[in-house]
A protein has these predicted regions:
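Acidic (Asp/Glu)-rich catalytic clusters
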Residues: 2-8, 28-33, 48-68, 90-100, ...
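Conserved, mostly hydrophobic/aromatic
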Residues: 14, 31, 39, 58, ...
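Active-site acidic/histidine proton-transfer and metal-coordination neighborhood
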Residues: 4, 23, 75-142
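Acidic-and-aromatic substrate-binding clefts and catalytic sites of carbohydrate-active enzymes
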Residues: 17-23, 41-53, 73-80, 111-115
Length: 142
């Protein structure tokens, strides 16, 4: 079966990691020129930037901010690391809300040397600890 060329970009979203060598401004410019309608911003593209201004930049091109990537990483061998992860996820939620992203993409995984059961429990606990803020700010976790 031959694949048909993509001609309808109305629901296309590109992650900034796809064009790792481009900064946020360059990615937004090129994606918009190509007719991409949505963007998922990876958190490192926001370093040193105001998330609200980043969202404004994206919307100024007619694109939608689809999500902010990545949150999660809740499992850890040490309690201190789990607490730091929860605080980092709260910052991601706040950044997503500021830029107008309706979703934070969670990449949860597991930790070597820890049982899958324990990692899953820590993921559940981490989401439970961050969900009230996400709900209050209107940001989904997925």
């Amino acid at each position: 079966m031959k694949a048909e060329p993509l001609t309808d970009f109305s629901r296309l979203c590109v992650h900034t990691i796809t064009t790792k060598g481009w900064g946020l401004e360059e990615a937004v410019e090129h994606y918009a020129e190509a007719g991409v309608s949505g963007i998922t911003v990876w958190r490192q593209w926001l370093e040193g930037k105001d998330p609200a201004k980043a969202g404004d930049l994206i919307r100024s091109t007619g694109m939608k901010v689809v999500s902010l990537c990545r949150g999660g990483f809740y499992p850890a061998l040490e309690e201190k690391s789990r607490g730091e992860s929860i605080e980092d996820n709260k910052r991601a939620i706040e950044d997503a809300a500021a830029m107008g992203a309706p979703l934070v993409v969670l990449v949860c995984g597991a930790v070597p040397g820890q049982s899958l059961v324990e990692s899953r429990k820590q993921i559940t606990d981490g989401i439970a600890a961050t969900l009230p803020l996400a709900e209050a700010l209107g940001v989904k976790l997925g």
